[in-house]
């Protein structure tokens, strides 16, 4: 009898060890931040909610807006909170595709890139790269003047907005339009684009929420 029980226990152990690990996972719906309407981005699997925290997801802005002109805009979001089977994200970065950037630079024009670190009103630090395409070729002095105007305007705008408003205006094109208006007084322009954005530091309040979530998940 004892031998039979041992055999059954051994068989159960083998069955459990051979179980498909995917059967233990749950599917979580990942959503964009509120300023993008909290739209659904993707589904990701995980055995525990805490394992999703800090995971990064890359999508095109087109996936959110369904605007074909947004296909070259690549966005990175980071999961920072989980509520049930909903994974909530925060912005992590933006970058234009290389092919798109190359297509903008034509003969007889100039590309001016302004790179600066900005801080929003609520304490978000970002490194921002703005690309300006001019209507005709510029000299060194004009390029410097355009770069300076873009940098000054961007720093001022960022300091007057909280993170959500700043990113919303970046993604909607409102902020690029403001930069265009400011810099066209120096030279004729054809286009202004946010080429790259990288988050350097999140607002203190947002970081506290992430830490709190991680501690709560670890304790549960």
UniProtKB/Swiss-Prot annotation:
Keyword Ribonucleoprotein attributed: yes
GO CC terms, sorted: ribonucleoprotein complex; ribosome
UniProt keyword terms in alphabetical order: Ribonucleoprotein, Ribosomal protein
Any one GO molecular-function label of the UniProt entry: structural constituent of ribosome
Record-linked InterPro entries: Ribosomal_eS1, Ribosomal_eS1_arc
GO BP: any one term: translation
Entry's family note: Belongs to the eukaryotic ribosomal protein eS1 family.
Protein's name in the database: Small ribosomal subunit protein eS1
């Amino acid at each position: 009898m004892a031998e039979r029980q041992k055999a059954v226990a051994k068989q159960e152990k083998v069955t459990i060890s051979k179980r498909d690990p995917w059967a233990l996972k749950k599917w979580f719906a990942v959503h964009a931040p509120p300023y993008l309407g909290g739209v659904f981005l993707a589904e990701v699997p995980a055995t525990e909610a805490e394992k999703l925290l800090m995971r990064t997801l890359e999508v095109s802005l087109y996936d959110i807006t369904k605007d074909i002109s947004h296909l070259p805009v690549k966005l990175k979001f980071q999961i920072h909170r989980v509520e049930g089977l909903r994974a909530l994200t925060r912005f992590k970065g933006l970058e234009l595709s290389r092919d798109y950037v190359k297509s903008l630079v034509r003969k007889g024009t100039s590309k001016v890139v302004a790179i600066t670190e900005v801080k929003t009103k609520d304490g978000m630090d970002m490194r921002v790269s703005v690309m300006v395409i001019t209507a005709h070729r510029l000299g060194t002095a004009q390029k410097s003047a355009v770069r300076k105007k873009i940098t000054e305007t961007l720093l001022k705008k960022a300091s007057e907005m909280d993170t959500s408003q700043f990113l919303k205006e970046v993604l909607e094109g409102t902020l690029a339009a403001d930069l265009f208006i400011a810099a066209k007084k120096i030279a004729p322009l054809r286009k202004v684009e946010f080429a790259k954005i990288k988050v350097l530091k999140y607002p203190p309040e947002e970081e506290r929420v992430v830490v709190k979530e991680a501690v709560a998940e670890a304790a549960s």
